[in-house]
A protein has these predicted regions:
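Positively charged, phosphate-engaging catalytic surfaces used for nucleic-acid and nucleotide handling
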Residues: 1-130
């Protein structure tokens, strides 16, 4: 799924910001993992309304995680949220304030994207390698 792969690449930008600004060398690997998971769950709550664990508990028979079942619009907004959160982390903005800003961003973007008919967008030509 190309959309999921783009989101994964953008996640790297997000995790680099977390590593640079929210962790210190003195933390154990377990403590660092908690910080990364906490940031990922904040994005999940803002976009999907629940943590990864809550989603998994509600969907025990589904493989993967909630992001694997996200719409193209949700994945695009998630990628944008990760980039924006990385910037906000770099600016030293607290998590509650970042959460509020990210919620506003997600709501605006989903509203715009939900009004777009993908069939109305220009299509790229099908280029086959020979």
């Amino acid at each position: 799924n190309l959309n999921r792969e783009v989101a994964k690449l953008n996640y790297r930008i997000h995790t680099d910001a977390i590593q640079e600004h929210l962790t210190v060398p003195e933390l154990t690997q377990s403590q660092k993992s908690f910080i990364y998971a906490n940031e990922a769950d904040m994005l999940n709550v803002v976009l999907f309304g629940k943590t990864a664990r809550e989603w998994k508990n509600e969907n025990p028979n589904k493989k993967g995680n909630m992001r694997d079942y996200a719409s193209i619009h949700q994945l695009l907004v998630l990628a944008n949220m990760e980039s924006y959160n990385a910037i906000l982390i770099g600016q030293g903005i607290s998590q509650p304030e970042r959460m509020e800003k990210l919620h506003d961003l997600a709501a605006r973007q989903l509203n715009v994207l939900d009004s777009v008919n993908l069939d109305d967008l220009p299509q790229l030509p099908d280029i086959k390698k020979e």
